[in-house]
């Protein structure tokens, strides 16, 4: 709900994504450990845009990253030395990998928004 508020999306309480932006399906993935995450994706996940939410518990701040990926782009991400996410999905598996280490860091993706939870403020970072 916080990310929907910050980004102006409608919270999707039904199936198919976490939020909607017009006719676009938005998927949120999040972690509460600043340095490490293990994120999983279902074998049949379909969305138009993936956002990653990263909590800085020490400072009560939530950072929002726009990965720029849709479900097709995400399928090209290498989740180990020999397989992409799509390879594992085709096997009916639920791939798990670090969004921080496999998407954000290699692509130098910076946060677009910061939510200061204590002060109840949304700050644009771009």
Residue ranges and their predicted role:
Residues 1-24, 29-126:
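Nucleic-acid endonuclease domains
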């Amino acid at each position: 709900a916080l990310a929907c508020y910050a980004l102006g999306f409608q919270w999707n309480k039904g199936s198919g994504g976490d939020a909607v932006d017009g006719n676009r399906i938005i998927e949120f993935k999040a972690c509460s450990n600043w340095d490490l995450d293990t994120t999983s994706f279902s074998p049949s996940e379909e969305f138009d845009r993936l956002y990653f939410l990263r909590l800085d518990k020490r400072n009560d701040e939530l950072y929002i990253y726009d990965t720029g990926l849709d479900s097709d782009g995400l399928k090209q991400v290498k989740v180990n030395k020999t397989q992409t996410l799509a390879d594992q999905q085709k096997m009916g598996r639920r791939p798990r990998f670090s969004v921080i280490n496999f998407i954000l860091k290699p692509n130098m993706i910076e946060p677009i928004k910061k939510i200061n939870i204590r002060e109840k403020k949304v700050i644009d970072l771009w």
